Amino acid sequence: MNQIVSRNSPDYTVEVSDYQLKQFQELILKLFQCCQERMQYQCERFGLPDAEFRCLMLFGEERYLTAKGIALKMNVVKSRVSKIIEGLLRKKLIHRIKDPEDSRISLLSLTAKGHQKLNNINAFQNDVHHQVLLQIAPDQRKAVLTNLDILKASMEAVKEMMV
């Protein structure tokens, strides 16, 4: 089993300066806060609570989803997913259909209104991301993207150690 090595552990060999650690923590916190503020703005702009917004975004990758599949992807219990689904059904953004292979299973799919809302959200997000990239000098974009990829891989590796 993997585990996270404490900075005080005898197994800890690679040094990270206190300055680097503090700077990293502050930058991650600021990025997280910025993302949370953007998420709140998006939810208000598109008239959806956070959980319904995140659930709707899952349909960008899939044509059909089940409540169980949504629960796994969102990392929430099935009863919570039921409330999220009910909200999206009430707003007529998704609809239920019976699985042709197993009538006990309900498949969830976007309605035309749901497709339109998702397209609007994706267009908005593309515009935001485009504007962010425009703030970075063209000759620095590749390095920024490479470093973000390294950061993502590092964070995923540490996450695996926590499991």
Question: Locations of the language-model features?
Answer:
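Short acidic DE-rich linear segments
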Residues: M161-V163
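Hydrophobic alpha-helical core bundles mediating ligand binding, dimerization, or RNAP-core interactions
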Residues: L21-C43, L118-I136, R141-M155, K159
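N-terminal leader segment of winged-helix/HTH proteins
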Residues: M1-F46, L93
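Charged, amphipathic alpha-helical coiled-coil/dimerization segments
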Residues: N2-R7, G87-D149
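N-terminal helix-turn-helix DNA-binding core of bacterial DNA-binding proteins
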Residues: Q33, E37-R80
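Amphipathic alpha-helical interaction surfaces
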Residues: C34, L65, G87, K91, ...
